[in-house]
A protein has these predicted regions:
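Polybasic/polar functional segments that serve as interface/processing modules
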Residues: 1-117
Length: 117
């Protein structure tokens, strides 16, 4: 999956959205409903009413990128439906995108060394 930098912020809209929306419709939803800025490089993940579909929207510096995925034989594991957004780390997002249960994924804690040895 092509994505912006490794340290990207990933937000999942927990409420299903109308999947007829394209780039502009989803960007407007990010601003009006999620109260976020769509042109910051943040990755926004949207779900359809059917749990087997997702859309991803992010700004890559020169334009809005939108990806759509439909699973053939299973459904995505989604958070409980409620108003708002939730944050995923990169490892959890990759598990979600692969159709795996992202709730079982924990990223390793990374920290910058204080000094070279």
């Amino acid at each position: 999956m092509m994505m912006p930098s490794h340290n990207v912020r990933i937000l999942v809209a927990t409420q299903p959205v109308d999947f007829r929306k394209g780039h502009d419709g989803l960007a407007a939803l990010v601003q009006s409903v999620l109260r976020e800025a769509p042109f910051t490089g943040t990755v926004f993940v949207f779900r359809a009413k059917r749990a087997d579909r997702l859309k991803i929207l992010f700004w890559d510096g020169s334009g809005l990128v939108m990806a759509y995925k439909r699973l053939e034989e299973t459904t995505f594991t989604w958070p409980a439906v409620r108003n708002g957004v939730m944050t995923l780390n990169r490892a959890q997002f990759e598990a979600l995108f692969a159709g795996l249960d992202w709730r079982k994924v924990r990223a390793l804690e990374t920290r910058r060394p204080a000094a070279a040895e």
